[in-house]
């Protein structure tokens, strides 16, 4: 898989589950901070299929394709899952396919007498939401740093694997 297919790869430590209010049965709103980049992530997970736990760590991968060596078909087709050997899904426990629907500006944060302008990316996985926050803005593109190749309405895959607790 070419490196440009891997949009984001990080370890997430879950800090809260359903912190505000439980709205839907069989859905958990999981919130946490990534270990290396210290980004804030909030995501909805189907808890019937893949329950997550506070204090546990999970490997997250956002990818443009589930295939190691070729691009995923642009439109959902039967062929997408008819030959699923040697895919990224082989190494993960939970996979969702969704669309980027929003880039937004976060509230300004104070850091050492200066304000930091941060951004968020929101992705919808069939109504289950995923948001990465506290991203720094790229001065050239105006998009979040490290996510310059992401566009609105782009299809992305979220792959998750539990790695501790």
Could you describe each region identified by the protein language model?
Residues 1-99, 104-119, 125-165:
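Mixed-charge, low-complexity intrinsically disordered regions
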């Amino acid at each position: 898989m070419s490196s440009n297919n891997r949009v984001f790869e990080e370890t997430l430590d879950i800090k809260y589950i359903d912190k505000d209010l439980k709205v839907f049965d069989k859905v958990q709103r999981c919130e946490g901070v990534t270990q290396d980049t210290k980004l804030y992530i909030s995501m909805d997970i189907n808890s019937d299929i893949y329950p997550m736990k506070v204090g546990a760590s999970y490997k997250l991968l956002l990818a443009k394709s589930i295939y190691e060596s070729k691009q995923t078909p642009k439109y959902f087709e039967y062929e997408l899952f008819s030959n699923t050997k040697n895919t990224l899904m082989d190494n993960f426990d939970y996979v969702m396919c969704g669309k980027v629907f929003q880039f937004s500006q976060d509230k300004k944060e104070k850091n050492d007498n200066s304000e930091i302008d941060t951004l968020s990316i929101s992705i919808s996985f069939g109504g289950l939401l995923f948001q990465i926050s506290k991203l720094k803005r790229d001065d050239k593109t105006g998009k979040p740093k490290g996510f310059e190749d992401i566009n609105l309405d782009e299809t992305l895959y979220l792959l998750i694997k539990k790695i501790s607790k």
